[in-house]
Amino acid sequence: MVCTYEEYLKRPKAITFAKMQTIHTEMIAEIGTDVDALELYDELIKIATRYATIRANWPLLNRDEKNEQDSGRTSCHNSVITHFNMLARYLKQQGKTAAWRDELGYEEDDPYNRKAIGDFACYLAFVNGINAR
């Protein structure tokens, strides 16, 4: 299966690379050199990378494999959202706005926001990956 960025952009709540860059820049600016925030960010990157691996392999799986792995994927996705929330909560406690978290949206407001949060997690894994060369 060949997937393209253009196809992705046609999906509900798709986030452009430019928007993801902006959100990431806002996030990094608020984290700054705060040791605890950096630790939370590292934990987020670890789970985002794990989730991105699962998600990137998803189109390659047959129906039985998807059924077998679906609960694990959902659990990992839930953990990604929890880690975003933990980082945002901590930053707010430090007097930051964490407006980037609101920009990603909340599942309670629109179920597609869950997918957008997963998309952004994949973006973070992508950025980490290309910087690892």
Q: PLM features: what roles do these ranges have?
A:
Residues 16, 23, 40, 47-50, ...:
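Amphipathic coiled-coil alpha-helices
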Residues 74-133:
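Amphipathic alpha-helical binding modules
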Residues 3-17, 23-45:
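Short, charge/polar-rich alpha-helical segments
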Residues 12, 16-19, 24-27, 49-56, ...:
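Hydrophobic face of amphipathic alpha-helices
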Residues 7-8, 47, 52, 60, ...:
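Intrinsically disordered, low-complexity regions enriched in serine, threonine, proline
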Residues 29-39, 56-69, 96-100:
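Charged, low-complexity interaction regions
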Residues 1-6, 129-133:
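Short intrinsically disordered terminal tails
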